[in-house]
Regions:
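Active-site-proximal alpha-helical scaffold in enzymes
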Residues: 88-119, 172-201, 261-268, 333-334, ...
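Flexible glycine-/small-residue-enriched beta->alpha junction loops
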Residues: 112-170
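Conserved active-site "lid/cap" helical segment
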Residues: 1-76, 167-179, 196, 289, ...
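Conserved catalytic cysteine-centered active-site region
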Residues: 25, 57-113, 142-148, 158-164, ...
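N-terminal extracellular/periplasmic Venus flytrap/periplasmic-binding protein-like
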Residues: 12-13, 23-24, 28-33, 44, ...
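Active-site pocket-lining segment
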Residues: 169, 202, 282-353
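Condensing-enzyme catalytic core mediating Claisen C-C bond formation in acyl metabolism
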Residues: 1-25, 146, 231-296, 300, ...
Length: 400
């Protein structure tokens, strides 16, 4: 029989703009910050009892190489005896880390774990593959910030290798999502995030980051990506994929930096370490879709999860849907029978306003859902997101 698994604490860094306040911080140092914050916030815990640290990270081609989870836990001050593993489900890596920890504890294999994710897209390197032959002049430099690199010709022939904005336009075309609706969705995200920031909502989940530089140091304590915009300003932006398309920089998520970490524990570990159970993890489900419309992935993932749990989408008091693109966000909501402007969906804005540090975002969605449930007294929360190469992931929690 599966055991109950609890989220006991959750913290993250601010989300930095591309080239912004966190751009000089290495990914391993960035990932260590929320782990260290968890240690400081929970002095009653015997940290030598942590069974594993699970961190999501999508890139792993630069300073986040060689198992960034292990690097981060050591840099954070956890004992050398604690193992760590880095998971990669691209955009959903941080959520997958939470789900993997949940399953390990629920099965009885583990009692106490840290899970989360990290991404420094500002510091993503350029990489070059090795030559296929001596004196080759066909060397190619690849940008690892986001999207395809070192493309497999068979993959391209069978499925296509559309860039992320193209997949979003594919969804807009297939599901008839207009430019006007996308821009309205994007504006709502910005407005809700601005209101949440003004109310201090995100301060509860953020650990400020001190960034050293030549002139001293800077304290980064707020998410940097939100923009003050209008429908008129959004309407003036040119489509990324040509005049007849609808996806723009304004109705898409950002390229960002950030890290997050959560404590997950069994009921026994909660008592043993003096923790407070804040939410119960109910389950996680994944699903695959055509890579060319990867943005629709949350639909089958959510349907699979709610069927498994015996719930309906209407049972959730808050839904954190990752806003990779407004087009896919709207298509997902409509397929699930949810209104475009439903108040329970991203009530504090989403990735269009906050940003989308790939490996961190899934963990951010879960903790933001938790904080919203605690703020409003709601019971059940759902976090879901699309994944590059055609997948969806969904995870449900219940406040205790």
């Amino acid at each position: 029989m599966m055991r109950e698994v609890y989220i006991c604490d959750a913290i993250r860094t601010p989300i930095g703009r591309f080239g912004g306040g966190l751009s000089t911080v290495r990914a391993d140092d960035l990932a260590a910050l929320p782990i260290k914050a968890l240690i400081e916030r929970n002095p009653s815990v015997d940290w030598s009892a942590v069974d594993e640290v699970f961190l999501g990270c999508a890139n792993q081609a630069g300073e986040d190489n060689r198992n960034v989870a292990r690097m981060a836990l050591l840099l954070a001050g956890l004992p050398e005896s604690i193992p760590g593993v880095t998971l990669n489900r691209l955009c959903a890596s941080g959520m997958d880390a939470i789900g993997t920890a949940f399953r390990a504890i629920a099965s009885g294999e583990m009692e106490l774990a840290i899970a989360g994710g990290v991404e420094s897209m500002s510091r993503a390197p350029f990489v070059m593959g090795k030559a296929d032959a001596a004196f080759s002049r066909n060397m190619k430099l690849e940008d690892t910030t986001i999207g395809w690199r070192f493309i497999n010709p068979l993959m391209k022939a069978q499925y296509g290798v559309d860039a992320m904005p193209q997949t979003a336009d594919n969804v807009a075309d297939d599901y008839q999502v207009s430019r006007a609706d996308q821009d309205a969705f994007a504006l709502r995200s910005q407005q809700r995030t601005a209101a949440a920031q003004a109310a201090g909502f995100f301060a509860e989940e953020i650990v400020p980051v001190r960034v050293a530089h030549k002139k001293g140091e800077t304290l980064v304590e707020r998410d940097e990506h939100p923009r003050d915009t209008t429908l008129e300003a959004l309407a003036k932006l040119k489509p990324v994929n040509g005049a007849d398309k609808t996806v723009t920089a304004g109705n898409a998520s950002g390229v960002n930096d950030g890290a997050a970490a959560l404590i997950l524990a069994s009921a026994e570990a909660v008592k043993q370490h003096g923790l407070t159970a804040r939410a119960r993890v109910l389950g996680m489900a994944s699903a695959g879709v055509a890579p060319r419309v990867m943005g629709i992935g949350p639909v089958p993932a959510v349907r699979k999860l709610v069927e498994r749990l015996g719930l309906a989408v209407t049972d959730f008091d808050v839904i954190e849907l990752n806003e990779a693109f407004a087009s896919q966000g709207l298509a997902v909501l409509r397929e699930l029978g949810i209104a475009d402007d439903a108040p329970q969906v991203n009530p504090n804005g989403g990735a269009i306003a906050l940003g989308h540090p790939l490996g961190m975002s899934g963990a951010r969605l879960v903790m933001t859902a938790l904080h919203q449930l605690e703020k409003t007294g709601g019971r059940k929360g759902l976090a879901t997101m699309c994944v590059g190469v055609g997948q969806g992931l969904a995870l449900a929690i219940e406040r205790v």
